[in-house]
Amino acid sequence: MSNIYIQEPPSNGKVLLKTTAGEIDIELWSKEAPKACRNFVQLCLEGYYDNTIFHRVVPEFIIQGGDPTGTGTGGESVFGKPFRDEFHSRLRFNRRGLVAMANAGPHDNGSQFFFTLGRADELNNKHTIFGKVTGDTIYNILRLAEVDIGEDERPVNPHKIKCTEVLFNPFDDIIPRIDKKTKKDEEEEGKKSKAKGTKNFNLLSFGEEAEEDEEEVNEVSKVMRGKSKSSHDLLKDDPRLSSVPAVEREKDSQSADSDKDEDEMSDDDDEEEDDEMDSDEKHQMKDRISNKLRKDPSKSIKQAENSDEAEERKSSRSEELRREARQLKRELKAAKEKKENNIKESETAKEAENTVANSALEEYLKEKEKYEEVRKKNTNKGVSREQQTLALLDRFKSKLTQAITEPPKEEEASDVDEENDKGWLSHVLQFEEKSGKVKDANMQDEDTFEIYDPRNPVNKRRREESKKIMKQKKERR
C-alpha cells in the first residue's frame, strides 16, 4: 500500500454519502479533475442524488449510480451539457475504492459515477477519476455489492443514496441552482392549499361528533342567513343568557322610508355584523375541536410513535430477510459445489481402481490361458506320461553338458535378458584364497606410510625420553 501514498496526489475536498448500506466517505482530487469535482459537489449541494439507486452492480468490478431515473441512461451535468474527460498520470485504476465518472463514450460525462471493487486497468484513459473512498467506509461499498443480480447487471433489491452532505467544499464560488420543476411544484401546492377542501371526518377519532356539530352549524346558518346573529340565537339553551334584549328596537317605518341614506348605512352595518358572526362561528368550531383534541392528545402521539416503530420493524425485518436469503443462497451453493466435488472425486477413484483391476485381471487371464494350453497338450496318463517326463529330463541334461563344454560368452549386463540368461548353467563357485602369513595388525596395508607430526605431544614425549636414554648411555661410558 505504500506505493499508493507515494503515487497518488493529495486530496482537496470531502463529501459524505448516506446510503442504505451505511455511510461512504469520499475525498476529492479537485486540482487534478476540477470539472468533475465541481459537477459532483454542486449536484450534492442541490440534493440531486437524494433517493437515487445504484442501478448497476458488476461483482469484483464496479458499482454504478447517480442516475435519478434509475435506468442507466438519464442524468445531466451542472453545465447543461456533457463535459470533457480529465486524465492524470498519477491517477490509475489500480485498486478498489476509486470514484470515477461513468460515460457512454469520450467526453460524454453527466451525473452518473461508479466505485471500483478491484483493479481495472482496462478503464485507464477512458473514465475520469475524481475521488477515493477513505477509512472503514470502504467496507460499506462491499456491502453495496452483496445483492442479488438479475438481467443486464441490475440488482433485484438495489441499495440507494438517502442523502448527501458536503463536508469540505473546495469551490467557494458554487451557488446551488433553483430547479424549475421544484418552483412549479411549489406553485401547484399553493394553489391546491387555497382551493376549498372537503372535510373527511373519518380520519378523526371523534369524527361522528364533529360531523353532527358541522350539520347543526349548517342548519343554523341557513335559517339565520340575511339576519344579524348573536350568541342568543346560537346558544338558546344556556341559562346564563337573558332572553330580554338589552336595547328595544323602535319600529319606525316612516323614518326608514323617508331617509334612504340611513337605510344604506344600516345595510352596511348589517353586512358587517354578518361577517363578524361568521367569524364567531368559525372560532367556536375551532374551539370545540381543539378542546376535544386536548382531552386525549397522548393517543395521537402514541399512534404516531407506534406507526414509526412499525415502519422501523418492517424495514429491519426486510433487511434481515434479505440477509438470511443471501446467506441461505451461499450455503446452498457451497453445499452443491461440495457435493459435486465429492461425486467427481469418487468417480475418479472408481475409474482408477477399475483400470488397476482391469490390468491385473488381464495379466492373470493371459497367464491362465497359457497354462491351460500347456495342460491341454499334456493330457496323457500312465506310461506315456512317464516317457514324456524322462524326455524332458534328458533335454535338461543335454542343455547342462552343452553349457559346461562351451566357453562362457562375455556380454554386457544391459544386453542380457533375465529370463533368457543361461550363464548360471556354466557358473563355477570359487572362494577367495586366504594366505597363512601373519601380518602386523597395526599396518592396514603394505604400502601404508606413517605420517609423523613433530608437534604431536606423543612424539614430543618420545623425543624427550630418547634424549634422556642417550644421556644416560653417555654417562655410563
Swiss-Prot record:
**Disordered: region residues:** 203-355, 401-477
- Per the record, the coiled-coil ranges are 308-381
Single GO MF descriptor? peptidyl-prolyl cis-trans isomerase activity
One of the Pfam families matching this protein, by short name: Pro_isomerase
Q: Which UniProt keywords apply?
A: Coiled coil, Nucleus, Phosphoprotein
Residue ranges of every copy of the PPIase cyclophilin-type domain listed in the record: 11-166
State the superkingdom. Eukaryota
* Chief localization: nucleus
Where are stretches of biased composition, namely Acidic residues?
A: 208-218, 259-279
Gene Ontology cellular-component annotations? catalytic step 2 spliceosome; U2-type precatalytic spliceosome
Alphabetical GO biological process terms? protein folding
Q: Which family does it belong to?
A: Belongs to the cyclophilin-type PPIase family.
Function, in words: As part of the spliceosome, plays a role in pre-mRNA splicing. Probable inactive PPIase with no peptidyl-prolyl cis-trans isomerase activity.
**Protein name according to UniProt:** Spliceosome-associated protein CWC27 homolog
Q: Give the encoding gene's name.
A: cwc27
